[in-house]
Swiss-Prot record:
Keywords recorded for this protein, A-Z: Disulfide bond, Protease inhibitor, Secreted, Serine protease inhibitor, Signal
Organism of this sequence: Olivierus martensii (Manchurian scorpion)
Localization, UniProt: Secreted
Presence of the UniProt keyword Secreted in the record: yes
Signal peptide: 1-22
Listed name of the protein: Venom peptide BmKAPI
Tissue: Expressed by the venom gland.
Listed GO CC annotations: extracellular region
Ranges for domain TIL: 28-86
GO molecular function: serine-type endopeptidase inhibitor activity
Length: 89
């Protein structure tokens, strides 16, 4: 029983440690947040938010990294802006 408990405790510690390492590896910019699973189809951008075609990327389903906060997309300069700002030019 002690072995099972010790194994479980080590597993939990490993999960916590690996999560903190992956978050510290990425330095997210203004209006970005870290996410463990970002779609490999690419982030939403001003240039593709109206695209109605589904992504057909056959690679891994997701990767860790930074993404725009809710309601924001990347503009042409790579900054996270509100979606409404995409159409103001």
């Amino acid at each position: 029983m002690k072995f099972v408990f010790a194994s479980f405790a080590l597993f939990v510690i490993f999960l916590c440690f690996s999560q903190s390492l992956s978050q510290s590896y990425f330095r997210c910019r203004d209006n970005e947040v870290f996410d463990n699973c970002i779609s490999n189809c690419g982030p939403p951008r001003c240039s593709n938010i109206l695209n109605t075609y589904p992504c057909t990327n056959l690679g891994p389903l997701c990767t860790p990294g930074c993404k725009c906060k809710d309601g924001r997309v990347y503009d042409n300069q790579g900054r996270c802006v509100l979606q409404t700002e995409c159409f103001q030019k």
